[in-house]
Curated annotation (Swiss-Prot):
Residues 27-74 bind DNA. GO terms for cellular component: nucleus. Keywords: Activator, DNA-binding, Metal-binding, Nucleus, Repressor, Transcription, Transcription regulation, Zinc. This is Doublesex- and mab-3-related transcription factor 1.
Length: 280
């Protein structure tokens, strides 16, 4: 009997019961309204496909979220197949990235592979050694995540970094726009407000003390035209003649000298030639 018992196979588990048929997906909209209908080929002919009740709205929202998740998974799988997601190895020099947790711990990375530099603090070194010896894969995973977060492309910084001097130049431009337009030096010439500049240095520092203000007097176009007309060559020839003026002066002097000589007295006024000879 013992031999027969030893020869019989012993069942490993309990006797299998009646096998269930695989679960068929059912239409959730029909289930909300108390009907059971298989989902295969039923979406087009569902009686409640356009229902707007609260339960059907919730189901529609869930379906949209699930469709978005499926599309995202497909896109990630395609990018992994094409190798877009994997970071490319940089052929340039080493990049030194400062660790945010420890200020004096630097990581030198070259592409994907990188080893943390030896920290100066012996306690932190012992702690890092024990952590790496206990779970090297976890430490490598954390380090890779930190590296990917800290390393960004230079084009990202060049494109998204705001300008340093935008606010300064914007304030200057607004200041020149707010200046009144009648501040120009010439009243006839109106200068645009964005081209008007003001001096940052006081004018009294380089002007003589007799002058009260560095601003020149205002001129108008009428004064300018009048001055130009008075200094024109036509007006000089029409109003003045230097030779006529000299002849009239010399004739007056000669007449006065002759009158004094005829009266018998000495002249009180000497000619210009005698005065120049005496001084010599």
């Amino acid at each position: 009997m013992s031999k027969e018992k030893q020869g019989r196979p012993v069942p490993e588990g309990p006797a299998p019961g009646p096998q269930r048929s695989p679960r068929m997906p059912k239409c959730s909209r029909c289930r909300n309204h108390g009907f059971v209908s298989p989902l295969k080929g039923h979406k087009r002919f569902c009686r409640w496909k356009d229902c707007r009740c609260a339960k059907c709205k919730l189901i529609a929202e869930r379906q949209r979220v699930m469709a978005a998740q499926v599309a995202l998974r497909r896109q990630q799988a395609q990018e992994e197949e094409l190798g877009i997601c994997s970071p490319e190895a940089s052929s340039g020099p080493e990049v030194m990235v400062k660790n945010e947790a420890g200020a004096d711990c630097l990581f030198s990375m070259e592409g994907r592979s990188g080893t943390p530099a030896v920290p100066p603090n012996p306690l932190s070194a012992a702690g890092s050694c024990s952590a790496s010896s206990s779970s090297p894969s976890a430490a490598a995973r954390v380090y890779g995540e930190e590296a990917s977060d800290l390393l960004l492309e230079t084009s990202y910084y060049n494109f998204y970094q705001p300008s340093r001097y935008s606010s300064y130049y914007g304030n200057l431009y607004q200041q020149y726009q707010q200046m009144p337009p009648s501040d120009g030096r010439l009243s006839g010439h109106s200068m645009p407000s964005q081209y008007r500049m003001h001096s940052f240095y006081p004018g009294t520092a380089y002007l003589p003390q007799g002058l009260g203000s560095p601003v020149p007097p205002y001129f108008s176009l009428e004064d300018n035209d009048g001055a130009a007309a008075s200094f024109s060559p036509s007006s000089l020839t029409s109003t003045h003649d230097s030779t006529l003026t000299c002849r009239s002066i010399s004739s007056l002097v000669n007449v006065g000298v002759k009158a004094e000589f005829e009266s018998g007295g000495q002249p009180s006024v000497f000619p210009a030639d005698s005065m120049s000879s005496e001084t010599k």
